[in-house]
Amino acid sequence: MRDIGATNLQWSILLIQALVDQGFHRFVISPGSRSTPLALAVARNPKAKYWVVVDERSAAFFALGQSRYTLSSTSPPTPTILICTSGSAVANWLPAVVEANHAALPLLLLSADRPPELHQCGANQTIEQEGLFGVQVRATHPLPPPDEITHPRREITRLLTTLTKQLTLSIPGPIHLNIPFREPLLPLQPEQMNWSAEPFPPLFPPLPPSPLPDTRALGETIHHQAGLILCGEM
């Protein structure tokens, strides 16, 4: 019999490894049962930097601040990745998602979900998460449960190619990835907990940093002409 828990963890480790290897290494986790494979994969990755924020609404705004910081510190800006469990937890992200959309700030939303057979039957903490954020996200990617994915590394590479393009748009914004997990959520055999993933090669060459402004020329211009300096978002 196939160990669904081992498949869940291995798939999550592959996904987190792929994200980190593309330079997306900041995670904000709101702990919950259904998202355990994702949270554990982040905690085990030595290149991942993560914060644990119990309240999902607060976590989303904290992640928003992290993404805003990258606008001035990296070129291009890189997304902060949010992780939470299923149900109403996901809905608590909405205010920050709206702000990220209008401020053009990159966020990657990884929501754990119940499998399809637990929808529309009154299961606990089960809502229609696909399309929950509507027009406030640049894209939504509903995925099948990991135990239904035949070639996980190949499919994750294909997904990351799409995500990387979408996350580095000229007008970035939030992207939603919805991931249903079947139980058991973790491996039945303890030795399966030690599984690790091979690194993923960069999907795109890194962009050169933005050139620094010519402050001397700017100073001469200001000295010889009357002008107005505007600071802040336009």
Model-assigned labels for residue ranges:
Residues R2-M234:
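N-terminal alpha/beta PP-like core and its mobile active-site loop of ThDP/TPP-dependent enzymes
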